[in-house]
Amino acid sequence: MILGLGIDIVEVSRLEKWLNDKKLLERFFNKEELEYVLSKRDGAAPSLAVRFAAKEAFGKALGTGLAGIELKDIAVANDKTGRPFLELFGTALQALKEKGGASIHLSLTHEKTTAAAVVIIEG
């Protein structure tokens, strides 16, 4: 049963500015996410933007927003085939449990100027 659906769209240029601010990046993204994003060179800004959109979409799918959730506790990872998925830790994992969520579906897309994410929480 679907418990929540969230979508978010981000302007890549907004997040491109963050690439020069290490403190800001470390506030919102975990080490593995940053290593992946920064390995993209020319694609770093869209990759960063789509990950931020995924975090925002997760908050919307919860129906409570991201209040009380550390954004570093929501991480976008990729399986062996490259399929993205959300890894939750700490405050984000607790929020999912409180919602009664058992699984999360994630879809990401980006172009040069925009990035979007859709999150579905099932219980």
From Swiss-Prot:
GO terms for cellular component: cytoplasm. Mg(2+) binds at D8, E56. This is Holo-[acyl-carrier-protein] synthase. The keyword Transferase applies. It is found in: Cytoplasm. One of its GO terms (biological process) is fatty acid biosynthetic process. Keywords: Cytoplasm, Fatty acid biosynthesis, Fatty acid metabolism, Lipid biosynthesis, Lipid metabolism, Magnesium, Metal-binding, Transferase. It comes from Treponema denticola (strain ATCC 35405 / DSM 14222 / CIP 103919 / JCM 8153 / KCTC 15104). NCBIfam families: acpS (TIGR00516), pantethn_trn (TIGR00556), PRK00070.3-2 (NF000832). Its cofactor is Mg(2+). Transfers the 4'-phosphopantetheine moiety from coenzyme A to a Ser of acyl-carrier-protein. InterPro entries: 4-PPantetheinyl_Trfase_dom (IPR008278), 4-PPantetheinyl_Trfase_dom_sf (IPR037143), ACPS (IPR002582), Ppantetheine-prot_Trfase_dom (IPR004568). Belongs to the P-Pant transferase superfamily. AcpS family.
